[in-house]
């Protein structure tokens, strides 16, 4: 393993410390052309940092031409001649064999069994929570996911909508469609947005396969390896996966939750945003202003205005994830960043996944017309268009008023479940435990007393039939071991109360063990399966 060291207490970001040490080792000859450096996951484990931190360092070094990832082989130090050449050349011709600056290894002759792992691009990508903690496994009470309550899906109404679409459109709806999106759905979305105070033209709206695809399209349209984006920290793991897979540097800025005596308004730390924009060439800032995932924090209006001012001054785009915005239980809905935008710098992404049916995979993106045109071309190259039948069904469902009725009902259901969670936490969690109290969304962020490890707690909670999501999966930079997320939307009040009761009992037992000297901290980097 490389002789690298990082200092967590330093004012220098961890990824910069790693980058600078590797760069120095190249210049001093400690690392020579052709040397293989550790995979990002391997080095992160060795240094005790998040894999994204190492990925950010590697992305910068790759953009400088000092290292190069190679399909099936790993990441290597480039020689000086290769570093001076544009990516995609090998100094002799423009052929694809030299596209990554290496002479391809000859094919290995084996026993006839193909080793698929040798063909993978590399080891990028975190294991999804849904794979590590399958929903309802062994009858467990799963507080892992932030997903809708399927027992309240209006199946009969949805079935009627599908039948109406097939009767009206026949086989035409099963043909290829427009990359822009199904026009009747776009009209319904524009009408819905208009009722919420946001005026949008058809040319400013692109139908996608959900927020995850919207992020992927933005990544492909705007970002190159080594480019930087600002993310909330902690954040939605899917966004990190999109960007780290593309070798984009993720700059995490802390999110204030109002717990642990934090000063300042809730939401992303604006001083941290300003510092990131001042010290880096950032392409865009990604934020979830309403009930941020995983913390449940909501940005006040004044903070939203200030974020837009910062972005405009630094000429940086803002990507606004509104996936939870319609799930407010109480009070008035706050204006979106897009509504407050006076400089045409906001790209808004949204989806039916939290407000209706996640399995249909339909979302949308709102942006300036020239941005939408670019995204449309990228989408066309990616998947041609979003599922036509799903779009048409949702258009009919919305036209009939089904979406409004469903939302009204689900806000009430989720409010009751959130209240049940608040009461259960207050009743069963030991002193010193804190949690957020969102007025909307689907999740709550819990902070254990200092010194306790949520991953250790999960091992024992799982044995008792309760699952939750440790905070380490959500961090861009150094994970905090004593935090975790609880998703409440998909469980009824009885199971929520029972799950938290078990969780509280497990935590109290761990506290008693600690007092007796039997408590043991686990390595929070170990995947729990």
Predicted regions and their residues:
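PLP-dependent aminotransferase class I/II
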Residues: 345-427, 434-438
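AMP-binding (ANL) adenylation modules
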Residues: 474-479
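N-terminal basic, amphipathic alpha-helical segments
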Residues: 1-163, 376, 380-387, 395-398, ...
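Conserved core of the PLP fold type I
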Residues: 161-314, 325-343, 414, 494, ...
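Hydrophobic residues in well-ordered beta-strands that form the structural core
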Residues: 231, 252, 318-320, 394, ...
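Short beta-strand "wing" residues that participate in macromolecule-binding interfaces
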Residues: 68-69, 200, 468
């Amino acid at each position: 393993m490389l002789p690298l060291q990082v200092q967590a207490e330093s004012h220098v970001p961890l990824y910069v410390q790693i980058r600078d040490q590797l760069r120095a080792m190249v210049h001093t000859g400690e690392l020579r052309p052709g040397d293989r450096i550790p995979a990002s996951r391997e080095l992160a484990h060795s240094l005790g940092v998040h894999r994204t931190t190492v990925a950010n360092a590697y992305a910068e070094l790759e953009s400088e031409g000092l290292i190069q990832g190679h399909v099936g082989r790993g990441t290597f130090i480039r020689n000086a001649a290769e570093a001076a050449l544009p990516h995609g050349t090998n100094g002799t011709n423009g052929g694809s064999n030299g596209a990554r600056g290496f002479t391809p290894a000859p094919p290995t002759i084996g026993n006839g069994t193909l080793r698929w792992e040798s063909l993978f691009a590399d080891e990028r990508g975190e294991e999804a929570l849904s794979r590590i903690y399958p929903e309802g496994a062994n009858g467990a009470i799963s507080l892992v996911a932030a997903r809708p309550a399927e027992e309240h899906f209006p199946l009969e109404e949805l079935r009627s909508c599908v039948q109406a679409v097939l009767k009206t459109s026949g086989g035409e709806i099963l043909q290829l469609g427009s990359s822009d999106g199904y026009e009747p759905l776009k009209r319904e979305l524009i009408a819905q947005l208009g009722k919420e105070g946001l005026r949008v033209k058809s040319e400013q709206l692109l139908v996608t396969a959900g927020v995850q695809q919207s992020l992927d399209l933005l990544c492909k349209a705007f970002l190159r390896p080594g480019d930087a984006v600002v993310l909330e920290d902690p954040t939605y793991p899917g966004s990190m996966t999109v960007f780290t897979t593309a070798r984009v540097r993720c700059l995490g800025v802390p999110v204030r939750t109002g717990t642990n005596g934090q000063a300042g308004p809730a939401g992303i730390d604006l001083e941290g945003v300003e510092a990131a924009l001042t010290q880096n060439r950032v392409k865009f800032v990604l934020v979830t202003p309403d009930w941020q995932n995983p913390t449940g924090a909501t940005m006040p209006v004044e903070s939203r205005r200030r974020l837009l001012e910062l972005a405009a001054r630094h000429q940086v785009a803002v990507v606004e994830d509104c996936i939870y915005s319609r799930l407010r239980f109480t009070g008035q809905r706050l204006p979106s960043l897009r509504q407050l935008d006076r400089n045409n710098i906001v790209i808004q992404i949204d989806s039916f996944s939290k407000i209706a049916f996640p399995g249909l995979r339909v979302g949308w993106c709102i942006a300036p017309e020239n941005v939408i045109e670019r995204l449309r071309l990228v989408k066309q190259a990616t998947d041609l268009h979003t599922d036509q039948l799903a779009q048409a069904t949702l258009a009919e469902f919305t036209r009939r008023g089904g979406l409004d009725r469903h939302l009204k009902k689900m806000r009430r259901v989720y409010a009751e479940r959130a209240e049940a969670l608040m009461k259960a936490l207050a009743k069963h969690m030991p002193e010193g435990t804190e949690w957020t109290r969102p007025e909307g969304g689907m999740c709550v962020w819990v902070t254990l007393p200092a010194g306790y490890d949520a991953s250790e707690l999960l091992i024992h909670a799982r044995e008792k039939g309760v699952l939750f999501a440790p905070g380490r999966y959500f961090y861009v930079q150094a994970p905090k071991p004593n935090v975790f997320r609880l998703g409440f939307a998909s469980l009824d009040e009885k199971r929520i109360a029972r799950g938290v009761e078990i969780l509280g009992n497990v935590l109290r037992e761990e506290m008693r063990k600690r007092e007796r000297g039997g408590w043991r901290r686990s390595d929070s980097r170990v995947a729990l399966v």
